[in-house]
Amino acid sequence: MYKTKGGFQLTLQTLSLVVGFMAWSIIAPLMPFIKQDVNVTEGQISIILAIPVILGSVLRVPFGYLTNIVGAKWVFFTSFIVLLFPIFFLSQAQTPGMLMASGFFLGVGGAIFSVGVTSVPKYFPKEKVGLANGIYGMGNIGTAVSSFLAPPIAGIIGWQTTVRSYLIIIALFALIMFIFGDTQERKIKVPLMAQMKTLSKNYKLYYLSYWYFITFGAFVAFGIFLPNYLVNHFGIDKVDAGIRSGVFIALATFLRPIGGILGDKFNAVKVLMIDFVVMIIGAIILGISDHIALFTVGCLTISICAGIGNGLIFKLVPSYFLNEAGSANGIVSMMGGLGGFFPPLVITYVANLTGSSHLAFIFLAVFGCIALFTMRHLYQKEYGSLKNG
């Protein structure tokens, strides 16, 4: 695979996604350092952390569409050039407003996810698309890279200099993409409104968006809330909590290609149903766990299923939407990003209301059960009885 043009572009775009996600997630791990120099309230911090997540999700729709129009090379290149400005602005931030403005445009780093999932399938036969998109999705590990490396580096050279060091990485990848990006990528120029009209009538888009809202939403949400949750509810050391959270992120990320491989070899919808059954069991375990050991089992179960599920879903998207792949990828990935924004808020609200977060995890199980019904409906419409395929 890697001896081909497609293999080279897959490698280039995956590394670009790593860098984009590093920039997208830079504020959160550095916030303990930033708030020592910038006077911010807890409420302002929550807004500052949320802004990149929201914009990084919403921008995925136009980015996916633009990829089909001009090609991944120019969307990646332009995104990296744009990212230089908020990164530099962040390194100079002295007020909450400057942090918010920086975070707003850092969302570009998260939005580039839809570029690769739109471009990469063009280079591979249908039976390899799941694996290819799964490998590309491993670029999500950029979030973990910032989480693991940015704090210790900031402890040595300061958070401002740490942020400015990202300028070198981003500029380097802008240059690499300019030189090695594929100018011959196949373009699909279907008018946006025509695509949206077609997509709005296709129930599969709504199902896939809902499923990804759960799987990728769980991936993002657990990465956000786990460190504080482990410290507050189980009294775990902050460093240990960070390591455990990093394991969750890494496990889900590296299992994403496995989901793609399974989707290539077997019926992806059937495998996804099995995946969600196991995820529901994991959510129930979290909903009844009061001990760290049982909670860890539940978290690892969710991580495994989220990673495999992410890969399976992006095996299905290009299969169902050929001419509208860019917009469909953008919409589905947008919903996944938004899925990571709401769960931490729900967990906090439920904990404040009931004194326990158990009910919030049961909500995840309920959402999973609803997803199973939609999967059964799609499978029966597309393939007939579940006994077939």
From Swiss-Prot:
SUPFAM superfamilies: MFS general substrate transporter. One of its GO terms (biological process) is nitrate assimilation. One of its GO terms (cellular component) is plasma membrane. The keyword Transmembrane applies. It holds the Pfam family MFS_1. Keywords: Cell membrane, Membrane, Nitrate assimilation, Transmembrane, Transmembrane helix, Transport. It is found in: Cell membrane. It comes from the Bacteria. The chain crosses the membrane at residues 14-34, 45-65, 69-89, 97-117, 139-159, 161-181, 211-231, 246-266, 268-288, 294-314, 331-351, 353-373. The keyword Transmembrane helix applies. Its main location: membrane. Induction: Positively regulated by the two-component system NreB/NreC. One of its GO terms (molecular function) is nitrate transmembrane transporter activity. InterPro entries: MFS, MFS_dom, MFS_trans_sf, NO3_transporter. It is a multi-pass membrane protein. Belongs to the major facilitator superfamily. Nitrate/nitrite porter (TC 2.A.1.8) family. Probably required for nitrate uptake under anoxic conditions. Also possibly involved in excretion of nitrite produced by the dissimilatory reduction of nitrate. This is Probable nitrate transporter NarT. It comes from Staphylococcus aureus (strain NCTC 8325 / PS 47). The lineage of its organism: Bacteria, Bacillati, Bacillota, Bacilli, Bacillales.
